[in-house]
Amino acid sequence: MSSGSDEVHIGHPSGSRACIHLHGAHLTSWKTATGQEQIFLSKEAVFKPPKAIRGGIPVCFPQFSDFGQLTQSHGFARNSRWSVFSREGDTVALKLTSADDNFLEKYGWEDSFSILIRYTISEQQLFTTLEVTNTGGKEMAYTMALHTYFKVEDITKARIEGLYRVGYLDSLDRREMKTDENPHISVTGEVDRIYLSTPPTVRIVDPIGKRVVMIEKFNLPDIVVWNPWVEKAKRTGDFGDEEYKEMLCVETGCIKPAIRLLPGTMWKAEQILTVINNGSVV
C-alpha cells in the first residue's frame, strides 16, 4: 500500500489494485488481477475540491439527489476531505465526522455524525463497508447511495439482470412509479430509475468485455440505474460527449424511505462486487 497527500493506493498479492482519493473517500480505479479496469472515470473529470469527481464511486451522503432537506444534490460527503482511519493489508478505511467542517453553515446540516467507509480488495472482488453513527442527541434522518460508475465496453450490448418485475421511480417521468416487465435491462437511451426494495444480488453482463459483475448488497435495498445518453452527455461539462457509450451507473443505496437513526446508534451496510471473466459471455 502506498499513499500521498491526496490519494491512497491499495494492492493485493494477486495483482489487483485500487486508488482512493481523500477528497470524497472517492474510489477512482479498481483493477482486478487480470489488469482489467472495472470502474469508469471520465477523461474530463475535474480534481479540484470541493467539486465532486466525475466517475468512480461517489459517496452520496447524507442525501441522495433531492431526497432530503439539503439544497446540495447528493449531499456533501463526496465534496469533503476525509481522513485515513486505518490501514491493514489490502484494506483502507476513511472517516468523516460532523466536526471536520462547518456543515451547518455550508449546507444547512444540523445533525452530529461520523461515517466510516472501508475498501478491501482481493483477486476479483471489491468489498465496501459503510458505518454511520449518530453522535448527536436527537434522531437523524438521511438517505445515501454508492454511486458506482461501472466501465462497460459497449453500453448498447451491456445489460442488467435481477430487476425483473421490480418497481421503480422513473426520474425522467416525474418519478412516476413503474414496474420493469423485461427479464433484463438494456440501455438504448437516457435512463434514470430508482428501483425500490430490490433483490440482494443483481448482475451486469458485459459481453464485449467478456465479463459479468455480480453486485451483492446488505442493508442497501434500493438500486439506481443511470446513463445520461447523447444529449445530457453533451451538456455535462466534466463528461466527454461520447463517454456515455462506455459507462453504466448501478448504484446501491437507501433512498426511499430514509434511514432514521437514533442517538448513539450505528447503521452498517456492505456492497460486494465480484468480477467473473468468461470468454463465453453472451
Question: Which stretches of residues belong to each language-model region?
Answer:
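Active-site/ligand-binding surface loops and adjacent short beta/alpha elements
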Residues: 139-141, 149-224
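Extended, loop-rich substrate-binding clefts of extracytoplasmic carbohydrate-active enzymes
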Residues: 71-123
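Beta-rich strand-turn-strand
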Residues: 123-126, 136
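Hydrophobic residues embedded in beta-strands of well-ordered beta-sheets
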Residues: 8, 27, 92, 126-128, ...
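Asparagine-centered strand-capping/turn motif at beta-strand->loop junctions
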Residues: 20, 130-136, 275
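Short, hydrophobic/aromatic beta-strand segments
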Residues: 29-31, 138-144, 282
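Acidic-aromatic substrate-binding/catalytic surfaces of carbohydrate-active enzymes
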Residues: 13-72
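Beta-strand-rich recognition/accessory modules
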Residues: 1-16, 23, 33, 97-102, ...
